[in-house]
Amino acid sequence: MLDVEGLHLKRGSSEVLSDIRLQLRPGQILGVLGPNGAGKSSLLGALCGELSPSAGQVRLDGRDLHAWPGQERARRLAVLPQASSLGFAFSVEEVVGLGRLPHASGRQRDREIVEAALAAADAGHLASRSYLALSGGERQRVHLARVLAQLWPGEAGTTLLLDEPTSALDPLHQHTTLQAVRSFADRGAAVLVILHDLNLAARYCDHILLLEHGRSHALDTPQRVLTPAALNAVFGIDVLVQPHPERGHPLIITR
């Protein structure tokens, strides 16, 4: 579980996040939405410890985030940044296996977990391929498998932070990726995912944080956050919102 209280973050003299309060709960996905420059990636940087808040606190399982020793924190918290680069000709299996470095579970168990994580990310058929030979979308799925392997199987007490994990993916793999994330949360992990697609967020997230100029415009269920008034205020778009005819979650249609 990750708790954020009164978080403020500065970059130089500019405050990019102001008074952010949220809780990542076991078994749930929190989606973060907002226009470019709203502070989404800065928020993820503060939550993973890459950026230090100017005020407020981030606690992982009741303990200040920076008080956790590196490997111990890595066994509980995994991060998929917006861009992951790797310049070595590792096989896909080796790249995903990097997620197991904080653990001492043995080679056989690690191999089993790597195989399971690749399957969850719909990347099992890529296992023996060179990472450098993959397309951008394939690389994105491999890095998803890596962070899933780091926390596998996704039990309570683990937290997964994802920055636009569907940005390079075709429509099918956007859904298979978020289905894998949904399954991970259903097994007990707490998940935060930054998205740009409003309808994907409405379908897969339990709660949504809507950011505007570094502040929380709304934090609630998709039904309460994804309203025409809120989306017009934050994104400047005119939309129709109606229940999905089969699933019931909000369906957003641009007018």
Swiss-Prot record:
An annotated Gene Ontology molecular function: ATP binding
Places the protein is found: Cell inner membrane
Domain ABC transporter stretches: 2-238
PROSITE patterns attached to this UniProt entry: ABC_TRANSPORTER_2, HMUV
Entry EC no(s): 7.6.2.-
Binding residue positions for ATP: G34, P35, N36, G37, A38, G39, K40, S41
Record membrane topology: Peripheral membrane protein
Pfam families hit by this protein: ABC_tran (PF00005)
SUPFAM superfamilies for this protein: P-loop containing nucleoside triphosphate hydrolases
Keywords: ATP-binding, Cell inner membrane, Cell membrane, Membrane, Nucleotide-binding, Translocase, Transport
CDD domains: ABC_Iron-Siderophores_B12_Hemin (cd03214)
Sequence intervals crossing the membrane: none
Quaternary structure and partners: The complex is composed of two ATP-binding proteins (HmuV), two transmembrane proteins (HmuU) and a solute-binding protein (HmuT).
UniProt-recorded name of the protein: Hemin import ATP-binding protein HmuV
Gene designation per UniProt: hmuV
